[in-house]
């Protein structure tokens, strides 16, 4: 994925002012920045939910800016928004089946998901509103894994989680990277530094720094 100098507006407000970043295939890249810096808007711009007015977004060699969100998703880009987007009245299994794409291999992907999140296998009949906050977050991530996505955009997966659940989520994201490329938004620097190979810092709607996470960690010591 290559994001090149995108400018995104929400109404009359100029939210992103020339954001650029690259997400190498098969690795985890993290976007860092304070609240309100433009990280979530960057994800939504990639997905076509808040389309940029200027700049390019290239995925698998194809320019995707200007395409409808549905068509972008069908190219193999999955999204895990913050705030645990699940169907709370539906069971775990129903939530997963609703995320299936036509001609997908649900059973194979379900096996992968249940190996990744054993709690979901144990609770597969329970409705989403009976799950804990951490289990709901796991289900939100799992829903994005039902299709065979090439790129997964994950927004603040550790938000509101207890330390033991953060550790479980970290292990799950590590395993995910063996299957798909990940662009992660994360405020927890310790988690981000242990997961990501590359980073981009967003500040006030601009990408101000990027590079190898290893170098950023060494600079902050």
PLM feature spans:
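Conserved structural motif at the start of ABC-family nucleotide-binding domains
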Residues: 1-3, 16
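The feature captures the beta-strand-to-loop junction immediately N-terminal to the Walker
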Residues: 32-34
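Helix-to-loop junction immediately C-terminal to a conserved catalytic motif
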Residues: 47
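Conserved ABC transporter NBD signature motif
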Residues: 55-64, 75, 108-110, 115
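Conserved ABC ATPase signature
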Residues: 127-131, 135
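A short, proline-enriched helix->beta-strand linker immediately N-terminal to the Walker B motif
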Residues: 145-150, 179
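Helical segment within the ABC ATPase nucleotide-binding domain
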Residues: 166-179
């Amino acid at each position: 994925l290559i994001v090149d100098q995108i400018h995104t507006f929400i109404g009359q407000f100029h939210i992103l002012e020339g954001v650029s970043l690259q997400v190498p295939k098969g690795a985890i890249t993290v976007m860092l920045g304070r609240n309100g810096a433009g990280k979530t808007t960057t994800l939504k711009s990639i997905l076509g939910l808040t389309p940029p007015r200027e700049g390019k977004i290239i995925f698998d060699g194809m320019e995707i800016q200007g395409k409808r969100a549905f068509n972008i998703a069908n190219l193999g880009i999955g999204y895990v928004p913050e705030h645990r987007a699940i169907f709370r009245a539906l069971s775990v299994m129903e939530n997963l089946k609703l995320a299936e794409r036509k001609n997908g291999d649900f059973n194979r992907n379900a096996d992968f998901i249940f190996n990744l999140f054993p709690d979901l296998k144990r609770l597969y009949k329970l409705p989403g509103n009976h799950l804990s906050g951490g289990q709901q977050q796991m289900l939100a991530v799992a829903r994005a894994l039902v299709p065979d996505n090439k790129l997964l955009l994950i927004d603040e997966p550790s938000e509101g989680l207890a330390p033991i659940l953060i550790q479980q989520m970290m292990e799950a994201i590590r395993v995910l990277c063996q299957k798909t490329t990940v662009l992660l938004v994360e405020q927890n620097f310790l988690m981000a530094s242990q997961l990501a190979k590359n980073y981009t810092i967003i500040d006030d709607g601009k990408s101000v720094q990027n590079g190898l996470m290893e170098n950023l960690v060494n600079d902050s010591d």
